[in-house]
Amino acid sequence: MQTLSQSLKQSAISEELASLLTVLANSSKDISQAVRRGALAGVLGVAGTENVQGEDQKKLDVITNDMLKDALAAQGSVKALASEEEDEIVPLAQDGQFLVCFDPLDGSSNIDINSLVGTIFSVLPAPSGDVSEQSFLQPGRKQLAAGYVLYGPSTMLALTTGQGVQLFTLDPVSGDYLLTVDGVQISKDTGEFAINMSNQRFWEPGMQAYIADLIQGKEGPRGKNFNMRWIAAMVGDVHRVLCRGGLFTYPTDTKDPKKPFKLRLMYEANPMAFLVEQAGGKASTGYETILDIAPSEIHQRVAVILGSANEVDACLGYHN
């Protein structure tokens, strides 16, 4: 099997970008170890602090954030980073070529129950001159690379550099990421959807009508049965979509009027949308294509509907 290093050498990307992606992959191996040790290393539970979104930080949120930050600082080609766990951007190499956005541990509420978590990342070109938050506010179409690492029964890396999507599996024997799926393609149609049904009463009328029709199954207007899935970690739900199709959504809701959206654009929605589009799927807020959004700030939140192209189109029909 081809290693990640061999695959990057054969791709059309620059040596500098390949080096950066290698550093991110190597960091994920260390994170995988920390996640697997869990209670044995005393890293479960809350850290006693909140992130910029007002969410309680888990100990592993802080640990994995520092691991990535230290690795990127040492790599030398990253001008600055933005993280879910950092209030502001973190300047690094003054002459760096890249900006990196990441969620160090997506689904961290799953940590204490030993369920799926992951790391999501996005690489953008760095502008010349001084770096600021404005430097990061580029549409998702500008991404040079994006991916996630899923810490599950096996540790897997999903990666795109704009030339399709590859899945790599971490070999615990050699310590290498090995290419296990080349050219991921999401099926156009599906019989699965992923949504947090407990928020149904807070959704917009269009989303309520769409899900109601799915639940009616064969007897309803869709004329077939659908299954619902929900992992409570975007990285896990999107991985399922890449592997066997489906629709994942965290839609607009009125549960907290100050926060109508849940997922962050820069380090959750954009990288996942890039992966999904590169695999033949679609990604939208319900009203605009995610990768075309002009960001207003690094911690901006958006609604997300992504997955099998025909099913996303069907969902969007209820919003229009």
UniProtKB/Swiss-Prot annotation:
Q: Which reaction does it catalyse?
A: beta-D-fructose 1,6-bisphosphate + H2O = beta-D-fructose 6-phosphate + phosphate
- State one Pfam family annotation: FBPase
Which ranges form a coiled coil? none
Alphabetized GO MF terms: fructose 1,6-bisphosphate 1-phosphatase activity; magnesium ion binding
Chain sites annotated for binding Mg(2+) 2: 103, 106, 268
What InterPro entries would the database entry show?
FBPase_C_dom, FBPase_class-1, FBPase_N, FBPtase
Kindly state the subunit structure of this protein. Homotetramer.
Q: What is this protein called?
A: Fructose-1,6-bisphosphatase class 1
- Lineage of source species: Bacteria, Pseudomonadati, Pseudomonadota, Gammaproteobacteria, Alteromonadales
